Structures are given as C-alpha cells and as structure tokens.
Amino acid sequence: SFQNGAGTQANGDLRGSVAVPPPSNVYMTANLKDLGIGSSDSTTIGLAVFSPFGTLTRWPDSSPFSTATTKAAFELIDIRPSIAFRPLPDLAIGLGADIYTFSGALGEGQVERQFRWPGGLGIPAGTGMELNGRDTAAGFNASLLYTPLRNGDGRPLVNIGLIYRSQATLHLDGQLLAGGTR
C-alpha cells in the first residue's frame, strides 16, 4: 500500500499473480566422450533454458497511474545451445547460440502492457487498453577461459574469462486492444 502527500492511495496485492515464467534457469551439460562420441574428453556440449526477466506487475485500476499501466508482463525465454572445447590444459573456448522467444507454454507467451485510457480520440475515458506482441530472435556468443595459476592439486587459483554476446533484436508483432476489441 502506498499513499502520497495528497492522500491518494494505491494498494497492490498482485491479485494473487506470480510471474510466469518465474525467473528460472535449467542447465544441462555432457562431455562428448562420456556420450560415446569421440575419444577426447576436451569437448563438452550444453543446453541452457531460462527466463531472464519473468516480469509480471499489476496495479489496481484505481491507482493514480492507471493511465500509464495496470499490468506489465515480459514472459521471455532464452534457449542457449553451446559447445566448449579445451585445446590446451589452461585454455577453453566456447561458442553458442541465444534464441529469444515468447512461448505460449508459459503464460500468454507475449510481452503485454495494460492500462486505462485517459480519454480522447473517440475512446471513452477509463476504457481498458492492451498492447501486446511476440517474436523470436537469435544471436550468438563466444567465450574464452584462461587459467594462468593453479595450486599443487591442479585446481584453479585464478581464472580469466571473456565473453561476447551479439545483439538480438525482437521486432514485436502484436495488436492494440481497446475494451477487448481490436
């Protein structure tokens, strides 16, 4: 609950909502030799799936900023297949893809913003409005890991890592709804 100096109060209990998908991470890796592929144990493949944001916020229609937003959702999923190779004992190289998408399997599968129309353009004030959209975009990443110093047991004491991630731009395709109508 919040009350400003003028006495306007906003209460929010998220209406029982939980961010869908919640910020979460799932990682799987496997050494190719352990999978029976090749004889070298210096190559590993991996797959990561996570939701980097998991954003869901709601405010009551009576809030002082309802003409700006009453609900915002950003249900993005990042799928990252990758491969890593260790050409030298102290150097590892990694390459991977970043696939950003909105999935209907989790939530509504779109970026969404809802608000109350302030009035004008022939739309009555207070009409529920919704902007939404979805897309899929891809990027890539490359990384290096250098271990210049190890202890007597061969465990790393110092690791130096570098990573590059390319840009991936989502060009949202969606709709504007006024009172539930396109």
Language model: regions and residue ranges:
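Outer-membrane beta-barrel porins/channels
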Residues: 3-11, 21-182
